Amino acid sequence: MHALSGFSLVSLLSLGYLSWDWAKPGLVADGPAEAGDQPSVAPPQPPHIIFILTDDQGYHDVGYHGSDIETPTLDRLAAEGVKLENYYIQPICTPSRSQLLTGRYQIHTGLQHSIIRPRQPNCLPLDQVTLPQKLQEAGYSTHMVGKWHLGFYRKECLPTRRGFDTFLGSLTGNVDYYTYDNCDGPGVCGFDLHEGESVAWGLSGQYSTMLYAQRASHILASHNPQNPLFLYVAFQAVHTPLQSPREYLYRYRTMGNVARRKYAAMVTCMDEAVRNITWALKRYGFYNNSVIIFSSDNGGQTFSGGSNWPLRGRKGTYWEGGVRGLGFVHSPLLKKKRRTSRALVHITDWYPTLVGLAGGTTSAADGLDGYDVWPAISEGRASPRTEILHNIDPLYNHARHGSLEGGFGIWNTAVQAAIRVGEWKLLTGDPGYGDWIPPQTLASFPGSWWNLERMASIRQAVWLFNISADPYEREDLAGQRPDVVRTLLARLADYNRTAIPVRYPAANPRAHPDFNGGAWGPWASEEEEEEEEEEEEGRARSFSRGRRKKKCKICKLRSFFRKLNTRLMSHRI
């Protein structure tokens, strides 16, 4: 009977049925006693690495930043680890994920503009070695659960071809939390939940946050803790659509704003998912030799319930509210714990940092923009990073008041760009909505709360802030310090000389899920990609007349979707 009970416990937890019902409070913190700043014993083997990425979680949307949302697990893990309070990410989904997995700025991946959309023949550059591939070389088993959003038009772009041994999740940017349907425009809808390289139709109906936590627990239950593990959990939460199990909504029933109420429920559900994963790390013998990294992917979307207060701006902008990240590291291996770090850290830094922890090596030949920041995080040393290129987007160059003359002949200030050098931050072009938006606690009815966010009256194309002294970006010093402006513009120009061309192809009608059994998935071969590139470069006339006739319908559809993509979908993130 006891043997049967033990079997049932493990089986149910592996399947996720038991993992959502905690018998004891505070299990997340149950572990070996921590000795404050005392050095930890060096691990006997490379550490297990658990990287947890959330989607659209705002700077203010965690308890330890004073939020009205309950996140007891995140609060406790952060308090016992190292809070990263000078940590930067990118303002939208694909760029952050690409920089995490390549260690390179967007200008060095060709993904400078917007996101990768479901019908675009685009993906993470296939000639760049990814973080999981590096970890595989170091002897790690690598697993991904959750949102990919780095392209899938060819099978070579899929997570299982880019370094992950297993994958369960969605390939596109946002799906329904229960049905896993995603629409990329009117009538262009398909199912998007995949296991490995197959469509996971049978898992539909399970709330994604719970499903992903259950799969993470199952991976831990079935893996030998003597072998190093990299587990990348990229939650869909708390990206729209705003959907939550009813029991979490009930906790926030007194919150007046409907969007904020749903958003808060989703955050708390995600917090409990992290608790379950942490418990599984302890239950199956991983915790004592593990490093848990928690990160948001971009700022919160304020008109969808998120909050970046007191920072300026929101998701999709280069103000601090768009690029300042939630982040912490929790690990028994930290030499100095229970503290806040203000060392400058960027999402590209995780690549060399984690490869170093794994016992691997990186070199200048890898072309990385990240730094190994483990000594800064674990020991409290100074960060090797002194600057961050937030981005240069040459396709977004429509700022009416920008010009080359306005940039001292050094830089065209109509181009959207942002850079941080030391304590200075410079923005050019149109950085996006720039208001300071308090948490949306007002009751929601048409025309009320979202009008709190207004587009600033932009009559300039250059902003300069001392971000150390003015983290809320309230005092523009561009007029007072033209010397600093000139220096940072020159630095932008230096970076731009190393940039590769932007890759942002038009939508391909062959990507329609109707051509793939109703699901989103790869549609192109290598030969077809070359053909597409030739057409985009204006060399389609070299094809035979017979071939053009054969593909007449496809050509017309492709032309139509190009227009649809550029006119209607270009701002859908």
UniProtKB/Swiss-Prot annotation:
Enzyme class: hydrolase
GO cellular component: endoplasmic reticulum; extracellular region
Sequence positions that bind Ca(2+): 55-56, 93, 297-298
Keyword set, alphabetical order: Calcium, Endoplasmic reticulum, Glycoprotein, Hydrolase, Metal-binding, Secreted, Signal
Cofactor binding comment, as recorded: Binds 1 Ca(2+) ion per subunit.
Subcellular location: Secreted; Endoplasmic reticulum
Post-translational modification: The oxidation of Cys-93 residue to 3-oxoalanine (also known as C(alpha)-formylglycine) by SUMF1/Sulfatase-modifying factor 1, seems critical for catalytic activity.
Classification via SUPFAM superfamilies: Alkaline phosphatase-like
Highest taxon of source: Eukaryota
Cofactor: Ca(2+)
Record carries keyword Protein transport: no
Residues glycosylated per entry: 276, 288, 466, 496
Pfam families documented for this protein: Sulfatase
Active-site residue numbers: 93, 149
Annotated protein name in UniProt: Arylsulfatase I
